[in-house]
Amino acid sequence: MVDFLAENNLCGQAILRIVSRGNAIIAELLRLSDFIPAVFRLRDKTDQQKYGDIICDFSYFKGPEYYEGKLEAKPELQDLDEEFRENNIEILTRFYLAFESVHKYVVDLIRCLDDLNEGVYIQQTLETVLLNEDGKQLLCEALYLYGVMLLVIDQKMEGEVRERMLVSYYRYSAARSSADSNLDDICKLLRSTGYSSHPGAKRPTNYPESYFQRVPISSTFISMVIGRLRSDDIYNQVSAYPLPEHRSTALATQAAMLYVCLYFTPSILHTQQAKMREIVDKYFPDNWVISIYMGITVNLVEAWEPYKAAKIALNYTLDTANIREQAGRYAASVETLRPQVQQLLKEGFLREEIILDNIPKLLNCLRDCNVAIRWLMLHTAESAYDPNNKRLRQIKDQVINDSKYNPKILFQLLLDTAQFEFILKEMFKQMLAEKQLKWESYKKEGSERMMELAEVFSGVKPLTRVEKNENLQAWFREISKQIESLNYEDSTAAGRKTVQLIQALVEVQEFHQLESNLQVCQFLADTRKFLHQMIRTINIKEEVLITMQIVGDLSYAWQIIDSFTAIMQESIRANPSMVTKLRATLLKLASALDLPLLRINQVNSPDLLSVSQFYSGELVAYVRKVLQIIPESMFTSLAKIIKLQIHDIMEVPTRLDKDKLKDYSQLSARYEVAKLTHAISVFTEGILMMKTTLVGIIQVDPKQLLEDGIRKELVKRVAYALHKGLIFNPKAKPSELMPKLKEMAATMDGFYRSFEYIQDYVSIYGLKIWQEEVSRIINYNVEQECNSFLRTKIQDWQSVHQSTHIPIPKYPSVDESATFIGRLCREILRITDPKVTCYIDQLNTWYDLRTHQEVTNNRLFSEIQDTLGTFGLNGLDRLLCFMIVKELQNFLTVLQKSILKDKAVVDVFKALLTAVNPVKGIVANASKVYTNAAAKTQKIWSPYLESIMKVGQMQILRQQIANELNYSCKFDSKHLAAALDNLNKSLLSDIEAHYQDPSLPYPKEDNTLLYEITAYLEAAGIHNPLNKIYITTKRLPYFPIVNFLFLIAQLPKLQYNKSQGMACRKPADALDWAPLVLGLLTLLKQFHSRYTEQFLALIGQFIRSIMEQCTSQKIPDMPSDVVGALMFLEDYVRYTKLPRKVAEAHVPSFIFDEFRTVL
């Protein structure tokens, strides 16, 4: 029969491809289980209220029209549904493809079995495939992997969540319209089983057998697979475990497969007592906790509870006396094995000759250690026992008591065994590599010695008192030739012949009385020694390494090892050099990757890389988790050092009197600092002892691990400090903002100083790490805060700032803001609210409208710079941009949906438009026309004013931020500021030149230069927020007249004050001039410039018309509304940096020159 796995064996390749895909699917399911969007769980009330109507389970399919009708009835629900779709369709598609691949897997398996039965593969039937060793393994694995997939899905993804995800995918994707879609079949297969993985949850009836039977598989195939698993040793593992008491460990992989496959024929579990007794006697006579795939553990006591036959059969294993016997046996094993392994690990004990002479003994020791560790780890694992099940609790307590279980001792044995195994493997690999070279060198030495002896007996070579003896001369020559003729390739014959040669050399010494000559004896002894070494060397076989690999399997602990994390960390904290032993344990755990990767590799599947990366990544993440104790301990010591340096140790002045030297020495405090610093160095040394290690396919560099760990700890502590330090009480009088910022700045300075201090002791670039991580924390939090303004949110797994190795923690929100940056921004907006404060532009200061006390000034932004740095100010600026966009969008909605839809108001606009035409002219009876129009529209201006003021307020804050950024940039990095300024000016002149002459170059759309330079310019404060276009707009009817009318409706509330400019007449009106001007300016900037021109023309006409009326009626004072309008024009020109003639085009220049003198 052709090799079953050969590339030209179509049947073998077909089954191998299915099995390979099965392993890849399980890896994908495990990977995805960490990315289930929390919203699909509908755990908290807010999610239920918000998304309850758009996330449905399979009840949706009973009446889709009803659900869709509910959505269509409410536009806001439709909007939320669309937003939800945009945010989740990508991840839903990924989940759906995984679910689809599970269904496709079982369909392909059934098709392959049908092809076998129908004779598609020549000379191959189900029976012949099961007779072949590889074929038997693959068919058993194919069924087993399908069962594992179903169990993994149910364990990691709750039924309700699956249903909701499938329904959402169905609604949002085009799958329903596609004719070849098998969505119906997938839904049938993966509908909720009612199973819950939470402890204490009740098990559904007929679970999991009814779940396994949703897609019918040939019963003949199932019974034949179970037959093979029951009777054969399909992986030939027993040869690696010769002792009968190790039999169940040898067959553990097969036992796990049998456990899963039995669910496909539950009748065996229920009624066939003889078969179940046979299965338990063979596979579970001394164990009842098994690992079914990559450390997923199952307790048979619980799993087989509903099945009569299985339960009865297992009772013999669970007999109290049997449990006591097994637990006692392993307790005794641990006691004898610990000193044995520690003895073997002593420096210099494991030498080459000892290994070669004691291979069987060493392998037996390894076997005993691994079997004991396996049994104890599985049978004492917390995850294997449901704390709510009384019987399981009793069994667990009995195991722990009878085995004298001590997790620290077991962990120590695991470490020692892993280290012993690692050393033995490495030495054996080296011996295997050098085997032929050494053998040839021993052969050469032995042959040469025989030739030399031959020459001694020839009488030619002088040797004290050796007579010439031609017989011995010829005999030694012959022996030399015999040694020379030994052939390395034919090891069996060479071994036999070598033994004969050794015997001959012993005999020649006795018969020819050669003992009297010491030198001859020495030559003979040396040759015998070389021949012995040749026998030892030829016995170095690769089979030993294979046995060690089988025996050392630790895949069962893939998940339970986590329960030992605290012990590992405690050991490392006490003795950082422990990390070297830990390395061996992790390499031992990495061998678990062979299980899922073997078949994927055999078929050369492209999935190899992604599956390897997933499992290797999981393991590396665990390594990081364990070793995180080192950075944690470092930071604890650091905190103490900083405390001592700030509070206890006095700073030594540059000049110091000799007699005061003693006062400044502070020996005990300095000794404490030195001790703590030394502890930090020891921790660093500990992790760097680990050496670069290949874990799966990921290279783990200890220096990088240390740096990442330090970054992670720094991020954790800084993020927590920012979260806790920037929580404000809005009712506090005065505001807590400045004190909290000062406090936060001191905390951040403490972190910074400690980092500066530590960098040389742990060999890292402190400043670089500090800046990178703090900027990442702030940018991530800004991104999260901005998500609330975005329709398509940036998820954690999409964020460029978030990282799996160095995650930025997410904290639950304490108010409407999602993060500390949002709280800071909203607190600033609250205390500078134009309704309660008045902003004086020349002083850059806000005053309280009622008390006239200073609220805050531009020092606030210097304080934020000190606390959060440039990143913080820049992040705040970005957040304000989003808020302005939102406010402008809300404003346009109000304008379009309320104001322009109100017929009475639109009629007022029309009438006013008619009255003011032509704009260059003067309005007759102006006072009455304007007052009437303002009075008729009074009710619409309240939301309008609020939006304009908010935008203006945020623009003032953006200006202040830009000033602070620009100031600090020029101060801290003047070259960067100058370079950016020059580049900006040259780019602008190039663009202007292009508009003058289109043949000149201009950055194309695909050129990112302008976008990149903008980010730099904004970070350096080289920009004007007032010129920014925040939103795209369409043409709006009556827009200039609406804004003009809005402005003149506000003017009566204001009056000119020489000391502070335009101010509120009554504090109750709550109106601030600067935000009003800047808000209107920003709003007009979003539209075509002709709107601004028309708006300014209307103001000019208003001033001229009222002035004309006053002069004709001989009123001597200039009306306050005219003063307000003139002030508006003056400020408008000043803020926009436009030439004054823009205003003078609408108002005669003499009025501008003179109006202040008459006030």
UniProtKB/Swiss-Prot annotation:
Q: Does the keyword Plastid apply?
A: no
Q: PANTHER family, alphabetically?
A: WASH COMPLEX SUBUNIT 5
According to UniProt, the name of this protein is: WASH complex subunit 5
Predominantly, its location class is other
Role this protein plays:
Acts at least in part as component of the WASH complex which seems to regulate washc1 nucleation-promoting factor (NPF) activity and is required for its membrane targeting during endosomal sorting.
Question: Which BP terms from GO are recorded?
Answer: actin filament polymerization; axonogenesis; cardiac muscle tissue development; endosome fission; endosome organization; heart contraction; neuron development; protein transport
Question: Which UniProt keywords are present, listed alphabetically?
Answer: Endosome, Protein transport, Transport
Q: Where in the cell is it found?
A: Early endosome
Alphabetical list of Pfam families matching this protein: Strumpellin
- Reported phenotype of the disruption mutant: Morpholino knockdown of the protein induces cardiac contractile dysfunction and loss of motoneuron formation.
InterPro entries of this UniProt entry?
WASH_strumpellin (IPR019393)
- Subunit relationships: Component of the WASH complex.
The family line of this record is:
Belongs to the strumpellin family.
Q: Name one GO cellular component term.
A: WASH complex
